């Protein structure tokens, strides 16, 4: 007498359907968010200019720059973290050399 065996005919079809619906909703939500993200990225990229908000000289990594492909900026590849302009508004990150 083994009570641990699982009989697949006793699976509740309602709970099975409910689980499938939840998984489908989660996957659909993820796909919709991804599509909206790409659409928003395209709109933001089209609205960027090479001198966005006039802060390019003061802060090289402005908030819009990672989404824009600047063809005139052929400097060395950027490394590190992009610093949005609204986080450090008073900091001068121009090409300065330490003492």
Swiss-Prot record:
Belongs to the influenza viruses type B glycoprotein NB family. Dimer. GO terms for cellular component: host cell membrane; membrane; virion membrane. It is a single-pass type III membrane protein. GO terms for molecular function: channel activity. The gene is NB. Residues 1-18 are virion surface. Glycans are attached at residues 3, 7. The chain crosses the membrane at residues 19-40. It is found in: Virion membrane. GO terms for biological process: proton transmembrane transport. Pfam families: NB. It comes from Influenza B virus (strain B/Beijing/1/1987). This is Glycoprotein NB. Residues 41-99 are intravirion. The keyword GTP-binding does not apply. Keywords: Glycoprotein, Hydrogen ion transport, Ion channel, Ion transport, Membrane, Signal-anchor, Transmembrane, Transmembrane helix, Transport, Viral ion channel, Virion. Putative viral proton channel. May play a role in virus entry. It comes from the Viruses.
